């Protein structure tokens, strides 16, 4: 579960290394975000000489959470870290590579470009 002020790792090569969640896109009073939700975040740590700089406000989609994700068939998926992928206004990733495994639920939420770039889909 991701809430405002949560720090997330960045799972792509967009230039950001760490994000802090500011807001959850959706209903005005949503408290937590889960895998597949879009958030507004600020870049807390970035790679030098890259397009994205520190303290820049971006949109990101959550691809991994430490909180368990329960599927309809009873399977429970849990990751070791909280991670997100930086996206643009259309939902396309800003980076060209995705690092680490991502959940299959992103395909159903029309993030097919992120799923196609991922090395492993669970």
From Swiss-Prot:
The keyword RNA-binding applies. Signal peptide: none annotated. InterPro entries: Ribosomal_uL14, Ribosomal_uL14_bac-type, Ribosomal_uL14_CS, Ribosomal_uL14_sf. One of its GO terms (biological process) is translation. Transmembrane segments: none annotated. It is found in: Plastid, Chloroplast. Disulfide bonds: none annotated. Part of the 50S ribosomal subunit. Belongs to the universal ribosomal protein uL14 family. NCBIfam families: rplN_bact. This is Large ribosomal subunit protein uL14c. It comes from Daucus carota. The lineage of its organism: Eukaryota, Viridiplantae, Streptophyta, Embryophyta, Tracheophyta.
């Amino acid at each position: 579960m991701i809430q405002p002020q949560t720090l997330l790792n960045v799972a792509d090569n967009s230039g950001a290394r760490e994000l802090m969640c500011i807001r959850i896109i959706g209903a005005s009073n949503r408290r937590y975000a889960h895998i597949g939700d879009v958030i507004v975040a600020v870049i807390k740590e970035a790679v030098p000489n890259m397009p994205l700089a520190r303290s820049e406000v971006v949109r990101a989609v959550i691809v991994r959470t430490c909180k368990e994700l329960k599927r309809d068939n009873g399977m429970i998926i849990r990751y070791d870290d909280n991670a997100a992928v930086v996206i643009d206004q259309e939902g396309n990733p800003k980076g060209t590579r995705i690092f680490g495994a991502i959940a299959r639920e992103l395909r159903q939420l029309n993030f097919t470009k992120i799923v196609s770039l991922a090395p492993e889909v669970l």
